[in-house]
């Protein structure tokens, strides 16, 4: 049996939003949560430019329509992983969010790595 035939048999793959992640939030919710506020213009990574709406007072303003689209794609992917009992690893290096991330991972029975690690070790296997 091929992967393609398994996908065709699985009803969760037939509907692009089987888990209804589009109902979890609106663009207005993101705005109210101040998700659109980024960092200072001087620290802007070139790869982020397609997702920038503009800037105000030297602060990057993210395009919330693009943010919502990609967040929904990520949530849909995670829903598929969780539905199939896959492993989800929560990762942060931010001291202000370490405890919250660890607590949430434990609460839902998943894993977290919140301490320092060698740069690129999780994203570039050629380096490690």
Question: What does each of the following model-derived ranges do?
Answer:
Residues 1-128:
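Acidic-enriched and Gly/Ser
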């Amino acid at each position: 049996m091929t992967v393609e035939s398994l996908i065709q048999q699985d009803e969760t793959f037939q509907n692009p939003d089987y888990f209804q992640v589009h109902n979890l939030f609106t663009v207005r919710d993101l705005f109210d949560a101040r998700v659109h506020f980024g960092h200072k213009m001087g620290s802007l990574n070139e790869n982020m430019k397609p997702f920038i709406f503009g800037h105000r007072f030297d602060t990057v303003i993210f395009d919330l329509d693009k943010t919502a689209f990609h967040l929904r794609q990520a949530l849909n992917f995670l829903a598929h992983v969780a539905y199939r009992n896959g492993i989800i690893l929560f990762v942060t290096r931010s001291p202000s969010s370490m405890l919250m991330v660890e607590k949430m991972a434990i609460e839902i029975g998943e894993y977290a790595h919140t301490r320092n690690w060698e740069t690129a070790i999780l994203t570039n296997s050629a380096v490690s």
